[in-house]
């Protein structure tokens, strides 16, 4: 069973689940999923536009854009921005509905090492500033080192868990590598 905000989501009807997801869960994908026909601002606001909830969005948009350092690219086409900027736009879109939880599927998979570091720092900042739970799927140990807790799955089953416990990212990364070495991982 999966409980979010005292709701058993696995037992919801499909229509209720869709509304619940739109209102409570933000999604970040590896491949950005931005619409090239829209500029940065419209890509971020798209979930609100589709829900007819565009009123009072400007202040929220401004706050998110400042946190993610994308305020200066709002009018640009998404075809004219870097991969790291595209991922920050995708993160902003996931935040615009003020979700309780963000599910991130390999959010750094298409990024270079510097952009990976930047995106992970933004995600940590968002987690702390907005008090949003972030669940990330990754095969990247470096990206995982930014997390508070790492859960290893094998064949879809949890088999190991390691917590950061206020360690630095570099120390936690060494712990992750050591754990993977012990279990025969890469």
Kindly give the residue locations of the regions a language model identified.
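Conserved ABC ATPase "signature" region
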Residues: 8, 56-73
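Conserved catalytic motifs of ABC-family nucleotide-binding domains
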Residues: 98
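Catalytic Walker B motif of ABC-type/P-loop ATPase nucleotide-binding domains
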Residues: 102-105
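Conserved beta-strand-loop-alpha-helix hinge in the C-terminal portion
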Residues: 157-181
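Conserved ABC ATPase signature
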Residues: 77-81, 85-87
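Hydrophobic anchor residue at the start of the ABC signature
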Residues: 91, 119
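Short coil-to-helix segment of the ABC ATPase nucleotide-binding domain corresponding to the Q-loop/switch region
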Residues: 38-45
């Amino acid at each position: 069973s999966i409980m979010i905000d005292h709701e058993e989501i696995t037992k919801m009807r499909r229509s209720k689940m869709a509304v619940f997801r739109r209102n409570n869960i933000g999604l970040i994908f590896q491949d950005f999923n931005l619409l090239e026909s829209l500029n940065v601002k419209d890509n971020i606001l798209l979930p609100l536009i589709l829900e007819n909830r565009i009123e009072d969005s400007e202040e929220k948009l401004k706050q998110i854009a400042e946190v993610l350092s994308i305020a200066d690219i709002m009018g640009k086409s998404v075809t004219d921005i870097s991969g790291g900027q595209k991922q920050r736009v995708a993160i902003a879109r996931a935040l615009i509905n003020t979700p309780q939880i963000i599910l991130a599927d390999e959010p750094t998979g298409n990024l270079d090492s510097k952009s990976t570091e930047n995106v992970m720092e933004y995600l940590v900042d968002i987690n702390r500033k907005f008090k949003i739970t972030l669940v990330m799927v990754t095969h990247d140990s470096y990206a995982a080192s930014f997390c508070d807790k790492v859960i290893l799955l094998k064949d879809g089953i949890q088999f190991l868990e390691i917590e950061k416990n206020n360690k630095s990212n570099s120390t936690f990364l060494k712990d992750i590598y050591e754990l993977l070495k012990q279990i025969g991982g890469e």
